[in-house]
Curated annotation (Swiss-Prot):
Belongs to the TACO1 family. One of its GO terms (biological process) is regulation of DNA-templated transcription. GO terms for cellular component: cytosol. The keyword DNA-binding applies. It comes from the Bacteria. It is found in: Cytoplasm. Keywords: Cytoplasm, DNA-binding, Transcription, Transcription regulation. GO terms for molecular function: DNA binding. This is Probable transcriptional regulatory protein Spro_2779.
């Protein structure tokens, strides 16, 4: 499986992402509450909740905070009527973009998403317009310094579907999204500590960004991520190191 660009091509945005940590926590808590409310508080029987827990821990959320969020969902203390909404569209340079939202007001959410596309030279598409280009997977990321062959052997034994290493030494392990927690636990038991673990939408094709389209795509992603209702933004934009160096 070809590596995708979510991690490798957004490193230059890390400082900006760190500045949004408060908003990220709010969104993760919303997902924890919703997942627990819909599927129960046992992560072993609720893959969506387990994925949300892994994401929370990857973002250094405390156990106390995430446990309170789960308790809110299980106990019915949260009376909001959140629903998951997926929007699809085309960004600068013909990039395919998928936006996962949790919202209690569809009209508000679609207006904010459409505004971001309009401001950044893209357009909101119809259901199914780009979804066929993405596959839902679990992704476990390991920092440089590990032996790829050893990780691969352990990952495949744990039930992973594929493993990809990058030039900088980062390793991504891909799993069926429902098995993300199980595979991560097996690799942890084998001595490999993950840098992050989350469910993602992996693109099957790439759209190369140049010095003109790359900044527009990053602006679109930033605007979408600034929307309170937007949980995740997935895209197939590929930004080369040469182009990234100009940003």
């Amino acid at each position: 499986m070809a590596g995708h660009s979510k991690w490798a091509n957004t490193k230059h945005r890390k400082a900006a992402q760190d500045s949004k940590r408060g908003k990220i926590f709010t969104k993760i808590i919303r997902e924890l509450v919703t997942a627990a409310k819909l599927g129960g508080g046992d992560p072993g029987a609720n893959p969506r909740l387990r994925a949300a827990i892994d994401k929370a821990l990857s973002n250094n959320m405390t156990r106390d905070t995430l446990n309170r969020a789960i308790a809110r969902g299980v106990g019915g203390d949260d009376d909001s009527n959140m629903e998951t909404i997926i929007y699809e569209g085309y960004g600068p340079g013909g990039t395919a973009v998928m936006i996962e939202c949790l919202s209690d007001n569809r009209n508000r959410t679609v207006a904010e998403v459409r505004h971001a596309f309009t401001k950044c030279g893209g357009n909101l598409g119809t259901d199914g317009s780009v979804a066929y280009l993405f596959t839902k997977k679990g992704v476990i990321t390991y920092a440089p310094g590990l032996d790829e062959d050893v990780v691969m052997e352990a990952a495949l034994e744990a039930g992973a579907e594929d493993i990809v290493s990058y030039d900088d030494g980062v390793i991504d392990v891909f799993t069926a999204w429902e098995n993300l927690g199980e595979v991560k636990d097996a690799l942890t038991a084998a001595g490999f500590t993950a840098d992050s673990a989350e469910v993602s939408m992996i693109p099957s094709t790439k759209a190369d960004m140049d010095e003109e389209t790359a900044p527009k795509l990053l602006r679109l992603i930033d605007m979408l991520e600034d929307c309170d209702d937007v949980q995740e933004v997935y895209h197939n934009g590929e930004i080369s190191d040469e182009v990234a160096a100009t940003l």
